[in-house]
């Protein structure tokens, strides 16, 4: 299928296959540059968001965070990606984040599919098949206390 290709659905209606979108919505801290610029976008926005999420998990804040939303948008579009220290963000993580947070969606890690990300050296110790089959044991299981008797916390 190619962008703009029309297919006939089983109910005889025509459907146009699209690979990019133009709508603008999302959490400000996680918006990819192409969204802010009003450009069409692809799945590469999801890889940008993954980069923002991983950055926040490692450092405590999104990479371009600012209390002022307009300043945050400017930073997303223009400011260089910086890291607090190598103690917090090791070199393999820096490389992964730098490539996920590439402002050019065509050069962004993952632009050619998820296998690109899964093969990054940051994930070298992950057996993706084992993960998919849920064969990894968690390093800890939180003791979940539920205030809602109708919900099973497990």
Report the location of each language-model feature:
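Conserved end of the kinase activation segment
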Residues: 34-44
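Conserved C-terminal C-lobe helix
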Residues: 88-101
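Conserved activation segment of eukaryotic-like protein kinases, specifically the C-terminal portion
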Residues: 21-31
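Activation segment/activation loop of eukaryotic-type protein kinase catalytic domains
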Residues: 1-23
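Short proline-rich PxxP-based motifs
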Residues: 77-86
């Amino acid at each position: 299928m190619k962008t703009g290709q029309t297919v006939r659905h089983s109910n005889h209606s025509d459907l146009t296959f699209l690979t990019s979108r133009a709508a603008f919505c999302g959490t400000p801290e996680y918006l990819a540059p192409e969204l802010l610029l009003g450009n069409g976008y692809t799945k590469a926005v999801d890889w940008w968001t993954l980069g923002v999420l991983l950055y926040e998990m490692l450092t405590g804040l999104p990479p371009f965070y600012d209390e002022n939303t307009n300043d945050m948008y400017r930073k997303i579009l223009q400011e260089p990606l910086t890291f607090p220290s190598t103690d917090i963000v090791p070199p393999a993580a820096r490389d992964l984040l730098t490539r996920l947070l590439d402002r050019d969606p065509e050069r962004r890690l993952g632009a050619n599919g998820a296998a690109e990300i899964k093969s990054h050296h940051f994930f070298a110790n992950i057996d993706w098949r084992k993960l998919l089959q849920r064969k990894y044991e968690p390093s800890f299981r939180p003791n979940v206390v539920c205030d809602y008797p109708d919900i099973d916390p497990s």
